[in-house]
Amino acid sequence: MLDQKDNLLSSYNYDLPKDLIAQSPTRSRHDAKLMIIKDGLDDSLNLVHAKVWDIKDILKPADLLVVNNTRVVKARLKIRLSGGGAGELLIMEPRGDGRWLCLGRPARRMRGGDQLWLDTSRDNSLILKVIDKDEKTGGRIIQFSNEFTSWTEMENLLDLCGEVPLPPYIDKDRSSGHEENYQTRFASKPGAIAAPTAGLHLSDELIENLKIRGIRIAQITLHVGLGTFRPLEKEDLSQLHLHSEWIEVTEETIKAITTCKEEGGKVFAVGTTSVRALEAAYLSGRGALKPYEGKVNLVIKPGFKFSVIDGLLTNFHLPKSSLLLLVSALIGRNRMLKLYKHAISNKYRFFSYGDAMLITPESVI
């Protein structure tokens, strides 16, 4: 049952001590804490404290994990501005013919027609051109040379002179190893500018143990972009729109889901991006889960009816984020806030490198 507060952004706020923002992962990926939510009572704190490693003993042989196989690219580029000075581009997505949507800084000094210089070595530079402002995102359309038409070609350039685009709450000076730590073990398809962080918990050893126990793993692709990480701003959520992100749900994954359900298993999404991809594919199939490739901007908030997933492995998310809305759609906003307060009291670590929550099928409202 929805109440009016479910459509107010301020209803998804909470206070987090800064020292609970994880600056690096646990020593082993699967050593993170795991809060297991046990039932669907809105006022209940029926939960178990465990480790992510224990998930192998919680899931059953017929169950299925669905992971996101996107790979984070080194999308942050340092550039020189027309008229002098330094700037920065965050590569977002291809727009065809060597043009890319980018977030620029300082944006006020990137006007249509301006040239930018990207140093690819000590003696060589690429000349880029600002085409126009993108009104939907506030970003800039930047012209690269025509050889950079897709993420495959662009990644070669980014590997040469780009940096991993870490979230602003991670202090780059306090930790290292991000090129490896900020990728999941399934990362194979370039195109994300942020990691699907729940997947970071699955170590090679844990993956092998899951398979030995008969727990299957299927993959989707959602290139994490503005739709996932851009902060929400408008208080009224009734007309919320998110930036589109590219997804792919394959026939192979659909067969795995069908088999799982036929055998009485449960489908657990690993991360909110896997939820969005699967539920968007279902809606695009008009009531049937079919292969899908393209952009989606699905909003999942309280009142949403889930049709594919039964449970969710997810991290603890930022206040007032679309990810908190999705978690609230599964377990209720009031309960989500109580669980987050409990996590803070028990020193759970938050955000990208932080601990995890397992929302079990019996806890979904």
Curated annotation (Swiss-Prot):
Main enzyme class: transferase
Main location: cytoplasm
GO cellular component, one term: cytoplasm
EC number assigned by the record: 2.4.99.17
Subcellular location per the Swiss-Prot or TrEMBL entry: Cytoplasm
Pfam families given in the database record: Queuosine_synth
SUPFAM superfamilies linked to this entry: QueA-like
Transcription regulation found in the keyword field: no
GO term, biological process aspect, one: queuosine biosynthetic process
Annotated NCBIfam families: PRK00147.1, queA
Family designation: Belongs to the QueA family.
Protein known as: S-adenosylmethionine:tRNA ribosyltransferase-isomerase
Organism of provenance: Prochlorococcus marinus (strain NATL1A)
